[in-house]
Amino acid sequence: MVIVMYSIKMRASKNGKHISGAERIVNKDEIEETVKELVRRALTHENGTPDFINIKIEEIKEEITYINHLPIKTIHCKDKEEARETAKKILRNEGIPDSVIDYAYEIIDKGGMRGAAILNLKGERLEPDKERGVRVKNIDTTKELKEKILKENLGTERTVDAIAIASKVIHLGVIAELCTSDNKSYTTGYVATKKGYFRITNLKKEGESGGRVFFVKDDVDIEDLINKLENKPFIIK
């Protein structure tokens, strides 16, 4: 018997400014409880109380791809300078030029994007909408992975969401991802590559905005990549 699965997406904003977003892939029996959980998350976000919450529920028609999560490693850094240099080394090892990494930090420091910027190795921005960026959608983790991350202190609830994005992104051929949280008080960021998901403490200072950048090869088929990032359903185990 085929189990029908549903994608539930939440986004919340205030005065048109993005506050929070989240997504789950669940079966029919779990829809009601999941919607409650996502609404609660929207209403209690540290970035403020939204004046607009959108919940979208869709049956998933396409076959879901199940993949293993990237190995998780935490690197403790004493301050932002050390953290940024640590992230830079990991990205450099993937063949990304320093000038492109510096540009990625500029984009992240500016903040305000709901999705990710996409940079090739020449430093060209490839996402069609530079304000919105590209949203990685139709993703979730298994309950087992979520429990493992929280029980074994591999990370936080935010890590659970981020490992889903990072694992899908790298699986689809992105060279690396650099990310810091848009939660003002959360200063741990990460770099993801095919070698793993590297949580890096103090990648930004408290109160600073966050952002996300994907690094891709110069010959990438950008339309195909964006289509898969946004639409192809993945569950990370």
From Swiss-Prot:
EC number(s) per entry: 6.2.1.14
An example Gene Ontology biological process: biotin biosynthetic process
Subunit structure: Homodimer.
Cofactor: Mg(2+)
Gene, per the UniProt record: bioW
Name assigned to this protein: 6-carboxyhexanoate--CoA ligase
Pathway: Metabolic intermediate metabolism; pimeloyl-CoA biosynthesis; pimeloyl-CoA from pimelate: step 1/1
Molecular function as annotated in GO: 6-carboxyhexanoate-CoA ligase activity; ATP binding; magnesium ion binding
Catalysis performed (reactions): heptanedioate + ATP + CoA = 6-carboxyhexanoyl-CoA + AMP + diphosphate
Broad enzyme group: ligase
Keywords, in A-Z order: ATP-binding, Biotin biosynthesis, Ligase, Magnesium, Nucleotide-binding
Sequence similarity: Belongs to the BioW family.
Keyword flag Magnesium: yes
InterPro entries (alphabetical): BioW
Protein's job: Catalyzes the transformation of pimelate into pimeloyl-CoA with concomitant hydrolysis of ATP to AMP.
NCBIfam families: bioW (TIGR01204), PRK01322.1 (NF002360)
Organism ancestry: Archaea, Methanobacteriati, Methanobacteriota, Methanomada group, Methanococci
